[in-house]
Amino acid sequence: MPFGGLFQLTLESTINKSVANLKLPPHDVTVLRDNLKPVTTLSTITAYLLVSLFVTYFALFKPLTARGRVACFVLKLLTLFVYVPLLVLFGMYLDSFIIFSTLLFRFIHVGYYAYLYKNFSFVLFNVTKLCFVSGKCWYLEQSFYENRFAAIYGGDHYVVLGGETITFVSFDDLYVAIRGSCEKNLQLMRKVDLYNGAVIYIFAEEPVVGIVYSSQLYEDVPSIN
Protein backbone atom coordinates (compact mmCIF):
# COMPACT_ATOMS: atom_id res chain seq x y z
CA MET A 1 0.00 0.00 0.00
CA PRO A 2 1.46 3.39 -0.91
CA PHE A 3 2.02 5.99 1.75
CA GLY A 4 -0.05 9.16 1.52
CA GLY A 5 -3.61 10.25 1.18
CA LEU A 6 -5.86 12.14 3.51
CA PHE A 7 -5.13 10.86 7.05
CA GLN A 8 -3.85 7.61 5.54
CA LEU A 9 -1.65 5.80 8.04
CA THR A 10 0.40 2.74 7.14
CA LEU A 11 3.19 0.66 8.60
CA GLU A 12 4.41 -0.64 5.26
CA SER A 13 7.23 1.87 4.89
CA THR A 14 8.39 1.28 8.47
CA ILE A 15 8.38 -2.49 7.98
CA ASN A 16 10.30 -2.23 4.72
CA LYS A 17 12.95 0.01 6.30
CA SER A 18 13.30 -2.34 9.26
CA VAL A 19 13.72 -5.35 6.98
CA ALA A 20 16.34 -3.52 4.92
CA ASN A 21 18.29 -2.34 7.99
CA LEU A 22 18.24 -5.72 9.74
CA LYS A 23 19.06 -7.63 6.54
CA LEU A 24 16.75 -10.47 7.51
CA PRO A 25 16.64 -13.68 5.47
CA PRO A 26 13.54 -14.27 3.31
CA HIS A 27 12.02 -16.76 5.77
CA ASP A 28 12.29 -14.33 8.70
CA VAL A 29 10.85 -11.53 6.57
CA THR A 30 7.82 -13.70 5.81
CA VAL A 31 7.34 -14.55 9.50
CA LEU A 32 7.68 -10.87 10.48
CA ARG A 33 5.09 -9.78 7.93
CA ASP A 34 2.67 -12.51 9.04
CA ASN A 35 3.02 -11.45 12.67
CA LEU A 36 2.47 -7.79 11.84
CA LYS A 37 -0.42 -8.40 9.46
CA PRO A 38 -3.16 -7.79 12.12
CA VAL A 39 -1.49 -4.50 13.03
CA THR A 40 -1.26 -3.31 9.42
CA THR A 41 -4.86 -4.36 8.78
CA LEU A 42 -6.07 -2.42 11.83
CA SER A 43 -4.00 0.57 10.74
CA THR A 44 -5.54 0.48 7.26
CA ILE A 45 -9.11 0.22 8.60
CA THR A 46 -8.47 3.09 11.01
CA ALA A 47 -7.02 5.18 8.20
CA TYR A 48 -10.06 4.80 5.96
CA LEU A 49 -12.46 5.37 8.85
CA LEU A 50 -10.68 8.66 9.54
CA VAL A 51 -10.80 9.53 5.86
CA SER A 52 -14.54 8.84 5.73
CA LEU A 53 -15.29 10.82 8.90
CA PHE A 54 -13.22 13.83 7.87
CA VAL A 55 -14.55 13.94 4.31
CA THR A 56 -18.15 13.63 5.55
CA TYR A 57 -17.58 16.50 7.98
CA PHE A 58 -15.93 18.53 5.21
CA ALA A 59 -18.79 17.83 2.82
CA LEU A 60 -21.45 18.87 5.36
CA PHE A 61 -19.59 21.84 6.86
CA LYS A 62 -21.57 25.11 6.85
CA PRO A 63 -19.49 28.31 7.28
CA LEU A 64 -21.21 31.23 8.97
CA THR A 65 -19.57 34.03 6.97
CA ALA A 66 -19.84 34.91 3.28
CA ARG A 67 -16.07 34.75 2.86
CA GLY A 68 -15.97 31.37 4.58
CA ARG A 69 -18.69 29.98 2.31
CA VAL A 70 -16.85 31.07 -0.84
CA ALA A 71 -13.53 29.75 0.49
CA CYS A 72 -15.09 26.41 1.41
CA PHE A 73 -16.70 26.10 -2.03
CA VAL A 74 -13.41 26.84 -3.81
CA LEU A 75 -11.57 24.39 -1.54
CA LYS A 76 -14.05 21.64 -2.42
CA LEU A 77 -13.54 22.30 -6.13
CA LEU A 78 -9.76 22.15 -5.69
CA THR A 79 -10.15 18.90 -3.77
CA LEU A 80 -12.26 17.37 -6.54
CA PHE A 81 -10.24 18.52 -9.53
CA VAL A 82 -6.69 18.81 -8.15
CA TYR A 83 -6.22 16.72 -5.00
CA VAL A 84 -8.24 13.67 -6.11
CA PRO A 85 -6.37 13.34 -9.46
CA LEU A 86 -3.08 13.52 -7.52
CA LEU A 87 -4.24 10.65 -5.31
CA VAL A 88 -5.12 8.62 -8.40
CA LEU A 89 -1.74 9.45 -9.93
CA PHE A 90 0.05 8.04 -6.89
CA GLY A 91 -2.12 4.92 -6.81
CA MET A 92 -4.32 5.81 -3.84
CA TYR A 93 -7.51 4.67 -5.50
CA LEU A 94 -9.64 3.96 -2.44
CA ASP A 95 -8.81 7.33 -0.87
CA SER A 96 -9.64 9.13 -4.09
CA PHE A 97 -12.91 7.22 -4.51
CA ILE A 98 -14.11 8.02 -0.96
CA ILE A 99 -13.30 11.72 -1.28
CA PHE A 100 -14.62 12.15 -4.82
CA SER A 101 -17.88 10.24 -4.30
CA THR A 102 -18.70 11.95 -0.98
CA LEU A 103 -18.12 15.50 -2.24
CA LEU A 104 -19.81 14.83 -5.58
CA PHE A 105 -22.90 13.36 -3.92
CA ARG A 106 -23.20 16.41 -1.66
CA PHE A 107 -22.83 18.76 -4.63
CA ILE A 108 -25.56 16.89 -6.50
CA HIS A 109 -27.82 16.90 -3.43
CA VAL A 110 -27.68 20.66 -2.81
CA GLY A 111 -27.29 21.44 -6.51
CA TYR A 112 -30.68 19.92 -7.21
CA TYR A 113 -32.39 22.58 -5.07
CA ALA A 114 -30.16 25.29 -6.51
CA TYR A 115 -31.35 24.27 -9.98
CA LEU A 116 -34.96 23.87 -8.85
CA TYR A 117 -35.16 27.38 -7.38
CA LYS A 118 -32.57 28.95 -9.72
CA ASN A 119 -30.61 30.09 -6.67
CA PHE A 120 -26.93 29.25 -6.16
CA SER A 121 -27.21 30.04 -2.45
CA PHE A 122 -28.13 26.41 -1.73
CA VAL A 123 -24.67 25.35 -2.95
CA LEU A 124 -22.80 28.14 -1.16
CA PHE A 125 -24.68 27.63 2.11
CA ASN A 126 -24.36 23.85 1.61
CA VAL A 127 -27.92 23.11 2.77
CA THR A 128 -31.14 21.73 1.34
CA LYS A 129 -33.36 24.26 3.16
CA LEU A 130 -33.04 28.03 3.37
CA CYS A 131 -35.22 30.78 4.77
CA PHE A 132 -35.66 33.99 2.79
CA VAL A 133 -36.73 37.41 4.05
CA SER A 134 -37.08 40.18 1.45
CA GLY A 135 -34.77 38.34 -0.92
CA LYS A 136 -32.03 37.73 1.67
CA CYS A 137 -31.38 34.15 2.75
CA TRP A 138 -29.95 32.44 5.80
CA TYR A 139 -29.74 29.03 7.40
CA LEU A 140 -32.97 27.63 8.75
CA GLU A 141 -32.44 28.22 12.46
CA GLN A 142 -33.10 25.51 15.02
CA SER A 143 -35.49 27.93 16.71
CA PHE A 144 -37.82 27.56 13.72
CA TYR A 145 -39.65 24.76 15.48
CA GLU A 146 -40.40 22.11 12.84
CA ASN A 147 -40.66 24.98 10.34
CA ARG A 148 -43.97 26.02 11.95
CA PHE A 149 -42.95 29.36 13.39
CA ALA A 150 -40.02 31.74 13.55
CA ALA A 151 -39.02 34.53 15.90
CA ILE A 152 -36.65 37.11 14.38
CA TYR A 153 -35.02 39.95 16.29
CA GLY A 154 -35.07 43.45 14.85
CA GLY A 155 -36.34 46.96 15.31
CA ASP A 156 -38.67 49.51 13.83
CA HIS A 157 -39.09 48.51 10.17
CA TYR A 158 -36.06 46.22 10.08
CA VAL A 159 -35.10 42.65 11.01
CA VAL A 160 -31.71 41.08 11.59
CA LEU A 161 -31.16 37.80 9.74
CA GLY A 162 -27.76 36.13 9.85
CA GLY A 163 -26.15 39.30 11.14
CA GLU A 164 -27.50 41.33 8.21
CA THR A 165 -30.00 44.13 8.68
CA ILE A 166 -32.98 43.89 6.33
CA THR A 167 -35.25 46.90 6.08
CA PHE A 168 -38.87 46.86 4.97
CA VAL A 169 -41.56 49.46 4.35
CA SER A 170 -44.83 47.67 4.92
CA PHE A 171 -45.65 44.92 7.40
CA ASP A 172 -47.85 43.34 4.73
CA ASP A 173 -44.74 42.56 2.67
CA LEU A 174 -42.83 40.99 5.56
CA TYR A 175 -42.86 37.19 5.73
CA VAL A 176 -40.44 34.26 5.99
CA ALA A 177 -40.23 32.05 2.89
CA ILE A 178 -38.83 28.58 3.54
CA ARG A 179 -37.56 26.96 0.37
CA GLY A 180 -35.79 23.71 -0.45
CA SER A 181 -36.77 20.27 0.80
CA CYS A 182 -39.55 22.05 2.71
CA GLU A 183 -41.57 24.80 1.06
CA LYS A 184 -43.88 27.10 2.99
CA ASN A 185 -44.48 30.75 3.87
CA LEU A 186 -44.64 31.96 7.46
CA GLN A 187 -46.69 35.13 7.75
CA LEU A 188 -46.07 37.89 10.28
CA MET A 189 -48.47 37.22 13.15
CA ARG A 190 -47.26 39.32 16.05
CA LYS A 191 -44.88 42.21 16.73
CA VAL A 192 -43.49 42.26 20.27
CA ASP A 193 -42.02 45.60 21.37
CA LEU A 194 -39.26 45.35 23.97
CA TYR A 195 -38.40 47.90 26.62
CA ASN A 196 -35.07 48.81 24.96
CA GLY A 197 -36.78 49.74 21.70
CA ALA A 198 -36.00 46.46 19.95
CA VAL A 199 -38.69 44.31 18.39
CA ILE A 200 -39.28 40.57 18.09
CA TYR A 201 -41.24 39.61 15.00
CA ILE A 202 -43.16 36.35 15.26
CA PHE A 203 -43.94 34.49 12.04
CA ALA A 204 -46.20 31.44 11.95
CA GLU A 205 -48.62 29.43 9.88
CA GLU A 206 -51.40 29.84 12.42
CA PRO A 207 -52.51 33.12 14.02
CA VAL A 208 -50.98 33.98 17.40
CA VAL A 209 -53.77 34.20 19.96
CA GLY A 210 -51.74 35.66 22.80
CA ILE A 211 -48.35 35.93 24.50
CA VAL A 212 -47.87 35.01 28.16
CA TYR A 213 -44.94 36.49 30.09
CA SER A 214 -43.13 34.14 32.45
CA SER A 215 -43.84 36.49 35.36
CA GLN A 216 -47.55 36.08 34.69
CA LEU A 217 -47.41 32.35 35.25
CA TYR A 218 -47.09 32.87 39.00
CA GLU A 219 -48.97 36.13 39.24
CA ASP A 220 -51.53 36.27 42.01
CA VAL A 221 -54.59 37.74 40.33
CA PRO A 222 -57.22 38.84 42.85
CA SER A 223 -60.67 37.52 42.26
CA ILE A 224 -63.51 39.90 41.52
CA ASN A 225 -66.71 39.31 43.45
From Swiss-Prot:
Name assigned to this protein: Non-structural protein 3
Keyword Metal-binding: no
Keyword terms, alphabetized: Host membrane, Membrane, Transmembrane, Transmembrane helix
Organism (species): Human coronavirus NL63
Location(s), subcellular: Host membrane
Annotated GO CC locations: host cell membrane; membrane
Major localisation: host cell
Domain CoV 3a-like viroporin TM: 35-125
Residue stretches making up the CoV 3a-like viroporin CD domain: 129-208
Residue intervals passing through the bilayer: 41-61, 70-92, 97-116
Lineage summary: Viruses, Riboviria, Orthornavirae, Pisuviricota, Pisoniviricetes
InterPro entries in UniProt: a/bCoV_VIROPORIN_3A-like_CD, a/bCoV_VIROPORIN_3A-like_TM, Coronavirus_Orf3a/b
Membrane topology, as annotated: Multi-pass membrane protein
